[in-house]
Structures are given as C-alpha cells and as structure tokens.
From Swiss-Prot:
The modification Phosphoserine is found at residues 232, 293, 295, 300. The modification N6-acetyllysine is found at residues 63, 244, 313, 321, 336. Pyruvate dehydrogenase activity is inhibited by phosphorylation of PDHA1; it is reactivated by dephosphorylation. It comes from Pan troglodytes. Pfam families: E1_dh. CDD domains: TPP_E1_PDC_ADC_BCADC (cd02000). It catalyses: N(6)-[(R)-lipoyl]-L-lysyl-[protein] + pyruvate + H(+) = N(6)-[(R)-S(8)-acetyldihydrolipoyl]-L-lysyl-[protein] + CO2. This is Pyruvate dehydrogenase E1 component subunit alpha, somatic form, mitochondrial. Thiamine diphosphate binds at residues 118-119, 165, 167, 196-198, 225, 292. Heterotetramer of two PDHA1 and two PDHB subunits. The heterotetramer interacts with DLAT, and is part of the multimeric pyruvate dehydrogenase complex that contains multiple copies of pyruvate dehydrogenase (E1), dihydrolipoamide acetyltransferase (DLAT, E2) and lipoamide dehydrogenase (DLD, E3). These subunits are bound to an inner core composed of about 48 DLAT and 12 PDHX molecules. The modification N6-succinyllysine is found at residues 63, 244, 277, 313, 385.
C-alpha cells in the first residue's frame, strides 16, 4: 500500500511541475487526421484539376502551423529591426503570404528546385535555413546565410537560387534550372516564382515559349497579391487572369490564402511536370499586409479597412488554426504553446543577429571567382586591404 501511494505521489508531483496546458494536451485524445473541402481551382487548358477534398494529418497540421507562425513572427521582427535602423537597404516582407511559401514546400520534394524574386525571406526559411541565418543576413552579419553580403534580396540555400533583385529576371533562370533537370535525366521540377507586378515583363513570355517548346519540368508561379509597388492589378494589366497568360501552357488559379489549396495544387502541378507533359502555370491569389517594401506603408493606394478585412476573413494562419481546433487535430492551448516557442526562437535569433560581428573587409573579395583570382592586374591589386570601406 505504501509503495502504491508513493508511486501515485511521484506521478502527481511530476504533473504539478508541468504547465497546466501541457498536462491537458498530454491527456487529451486528438484525431490523427481529418478531411477538408477546399476551393476548386480555376482551370486553363486542363480537363481535370487538383482535388476539392484533402486529408490533413495532425503531424502535418502542427508542422504547417509552426512554419507559418515562424515566417510571420520573423517578418514582424524584421520590420522592428528595420525601424530601429539595424536592418538597412532594401527589405520586402511577406507577412500575409505564408500559405504560399509553406504550401508550395509541402507539395514538392527537398530535391526539387525553387527560385523567386526579392520577397524571399519565407522561401529561404521553408527551403531549410534557420531564422538565425536569415535575420543575421538582414543585419549584414558574418553568421548570415550569405556571410552578410546578400541582404534581404539575395539569400540562397541548397536547391534555392534566391532572392533576385531585378523584376522578372529570375523567370528565365528558372526555365534554365528546369532545362538542367531534364538534361540530367532527373525526376525533379523547378518552381519559378514572380509577382503580378512582373507578369507583364517580356522575358517571362520568352521563357514560357522555350519551356513549352522543350517540355521543361517548370512550374511558373505568379504570386498575385493584388498590387505591384503601388498599382492595383486592374490598372496594370489588360487581363488579370494570370493563370491564362501562358496561352499554350495549361494553368491553375489557386486560393493562395489556404495552405491546403496551395499544397494540393502544387502536388498536381508537380505530377504534371514529372509526367513529361512540359510546363504548367499557377496563379496564387494572395495578399501582403505590409507595403511593397519598407520604404512605404502601403496605405496610400489601399485603405486600412481593406487590409483589416483580409486579416479578419482570410488570414492563412487563422484559417489553419480554426480547421485544426474544430476537427480535434489540436487544441487552442497546444497552439498557444507553439506561439510562445516561436516567439522565443525569433527573439533568440534577433539577439544573435545584432550581436554577431560584421564580416571583415577581406570578405569582400571572396566567392566571386571559382578559383584564386589574379590579384595583380596591370601592377595593381584591386583587393588591397583597407582599414575602412568609407
């Protein structure tokens, strides 16, 4: 009897040391998965599209929620550091568009490829880099993913080719990556992203043509967040059906605020490309909460009421949270714990990004030539070490 009472006492004392929310989560029986109806995609030159129902497992749901919250909090921290003048130069934030970067990654393999424009922080994270490396790159520190030399627009990871600052210029590069996949006989695809503001660039249509001629495994993806730098899509494009812009290339228009819609559409598009049918085009209808960049608040060409309406009705994190709670895939308390953990991760990363040293001046000449450069050119050394760059 004494042994039994002692065992019960140990169990109770262990439980009392844990937060009440953790005890509740541990004792609750959650569903392993749930089936959801998702919005049907608009189709162009396709007889069938992605499914209109999908299964979400508890494990995947928790992973997607954590990833989207991490991207959201990371971008808000970048906003704060920029306003403190710790981050300088160009900086384009993607809060509001988390379902795009997380959903696209959920629909492909790690060995697949991705290239995007300058709003790249979220994709850099989903492709496998840490928040520490991203924030340190934003602050120009040695521990950044590009040694502090790339900044907001030029981050890279394995099978992730940036981060490109010239509007639309990454699209032909993406077609070239897809050409390499086909040439090397690999069962891989390249996700080639651009925004609605770049969709009228001539080089994009040239890339469409070559990709279709050579049947390249390229998924062209237009992130339509409704506005270019400060111009609505209706004022910039004669046709806002961006998923039809490929003409001879099949296309999908996808709810880019719903991570499950994005995931299923990406799986469908990737399977299409892997089957040897050639390229496909996806338009993700999404929304950014910040302005085009940190140089503008983003309320001179749209109202604060419009932004708030999207936040209250279509926020991608809120949508996933409601689905998981209502289908017993997670509890409110469990998701709050994730929120707390994410906030701590972001704060720790921000401390690292502000305390890490800046790269030394000699770093300026590294990673330019594939082999040792000819330092002496016409009797001059262009990489002579100065005490200051000013």
């Amino acid at each position: 009897m004494r042994k039994m009472l002692a065992a019960v006492s140990r169990v109770l004392s262990g439980a009392s040391q844990k937060p009440a929310s953790r005890v509740l989560v541990a004792s609750r029986n959650f569903a392993n998965d749930a089936t959801f109806e998702i919005k049907k995609c608009d189709l162009h030159r396709l007889e069938e599209g992605p499914p209109v129902t999908t299964v979400l497992t508890r494990e995947d749901g928790l992973k997607y929620y954590r990833m989207m919250q991490t991207v959201r909090r990371m971008e808000l921290k970048a906003d704060q550091l920029y306003k403190q003048k710790i981050i300088r130069g160009f900086c384009h934030l993607c809060d509001g568009q988390e379902a795009c970067c997380v959903g696209l990654e959920a629909g492909i393999n790690p060995t697949d490829h991705l290239i995007t424009a300058y709003r790249a922080h979220g994709f850099t994270f989903t492709r496998g880099l840490s928040v520490r490396e991203i924030l340190a790159e934003l602050t120009g520190r040695k521990g950044g993913c590009a040694k502090g030399k790339g900044g907001s627009m030029h981050m890279y990871a394995k099978n992730f080719y940036g981060g490109n600052g010239i509007v639309g210029a990454q699209v032909p590069l993406g077609a070239g990556i897809a050409l390499a996949c086909k040439y090397n006989g690999k069962d891989e695809v390249c996700l080639t992203l651009y925004g609605d503001g770049a969709a009228n660039q001539g080089q994009i249509f040239e890339a469409y043509n070559m990709a279709a001629l050579w049947k390249l495994p390229c998924i062209f993806i237009c992130e339509n967040n409704r506005y270019g730098m400060g111009t609505s899509v209706e004022r910039a494009a004669a046709s806002t059906d961006y998923y039809k812009r490929g003409d001879f290339i099949p296309g999908l228009r996808v709810d880019g605020m719903d991570i499950l819609c994005v995931r299923e559409a990406t799986r469908f598009a990737a399977a299409y490309c892997r089957s040897g049918k050639g390229p496909i085009l996806m338009e993700l209808q999404t929304y950014r909460y910040h302005g085009h960049s940190m140089s503008g608040p983003g309320v001179s060409y749209r109202t604060r009421e419009e932004i708030q309406e999207v936040r209250s009705k279509s926020d991608p994190i809120m949508l996933l949270k409601d689905r998981m709670v209502n289908s017993n895939l997670a509890s409110v308390e469990e998701l709050k714990e994730i929120d707390v953990e994410v906030r701590k991760e972001i704060e720790d990363a921000a401390q690292f990004a502000t305390a890490d040293p800046e790269p030394p001046l000699e770093e300026l000449g590294y990673h330019i030539y594939s082999s040792d450069p000819p330092f002496e050119v016409r009797g001059a050394n262009q990489w002579i070490k100065f005490k200051s760059v000013s």
